[in-house]
Amino acid sequence: MSNKSLAGEHNAQTILVTGGAGFIGSHTCVELLEQNYNVVILDDLSNSCVTAVDRIRELSGANADQLKFVEASILDREACERVFSENDIDAIIHFAGFKAVGESTQKPLEYYWNNVAGSLVLFDVARNHGVKNIIFSSSATVYGEPEMIPITEECPLHEATNPYGETKVMLERILTDFYRADSEWNVVLLRYFNPIGAHISGRIGEDPKDIPNNLLPYVAQVAVGKLECIQVFGNDYPTPDGTGVRDYIHVVDLARGHVKALDFMGGKVGTGKAIGLGSIEGASTEYGTRTGVAIFNLGTGTGSSVLDVIHAFEKACGKKLPYKICPRRPGDIATNYAACDKAREELGWVAEYDLARMCEDSWRWQSNNPNGYKE
């Protein structure tokens, strides 16, 4: 079955967003609805909350009726079949998956089963319904310890240091193999760096189920009084202040990158040339018929240290935050930030928000919702 064209107007297109109730997914759904797309969320709520869906509708105003929500796992073939049978899906933005690095080392079977086997169920059903347009939520973890800074899309992939990262590498390779076997596949791999921040309204944001694994939500929970002290893992790295440096990107900037990627897939921006992954090249650049595998880093292109983040958050919340220096964690690297030239040139996308704004928006979300989506 031939692939769907993405050449039409946004309001004539329906995007399936797996994991759309999650942190990045919810912000992406808001941006899609703002751009007048029809959106179907498929989410089993294992890492999220239905309240997020209600708030997406709230933020979408007059376009709220263009959103549908289906509570189901990507492993549920019958549910996936119903989604495609009952909705004229044009493209998929695939966020769904378990995502805790530490947990993945303790539960590798569950991670490979859910993230890889579940994705294969989704891809198979999509192909059977003639949908071969996929934006995949990948990660900078696929680069491992980088050989150069800033990291470009041409940097080689390294063996992941944990099962979560390995699922990202595997799915990138699987989608690339699909295109090698069938040139109708239209795939964009978005490699995120470190998404933080929240919607400016303070109505949606990051809501970890347990003690946060990532720096910013941990800092925010210390600021709101839920946790006692920030742990800084290592202050002897070869960086300006000795703490690890990462590329933090506002989640709204990241969400807008997905909208730009849809335009790119439809031939509406960029040259349509696929990049990275060896000999893979875009097969077509005609309007609405671009195919191939394209890879883009989404970051700001600048690095901020752990102490930079803590001090920026102190300014946002107006209080000093306690922190203690702890030993380095195994596998952590000193510096990691992106080269984003290709996203600018091919997608017409540039991150707009700085670290101060990320912290301000995160604090607004956390202070307005100290218990996340729990009332």
PLM-predicted stretches and their roles:
Residues 50, 54, 193-214, 225-246:
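Short, flexible, glycine-rich and Lys/Arg-enriched loop motifs at helix boundaries
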Residues 1-198:
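N-terminal Rossmann-like NAD(P)+-binding domain of SDR-like oxidoreductases, especially those catalyzing
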Residues 112, 161-169, 205-213, 217, ...:
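Short-chain dehydrogenase/reductase
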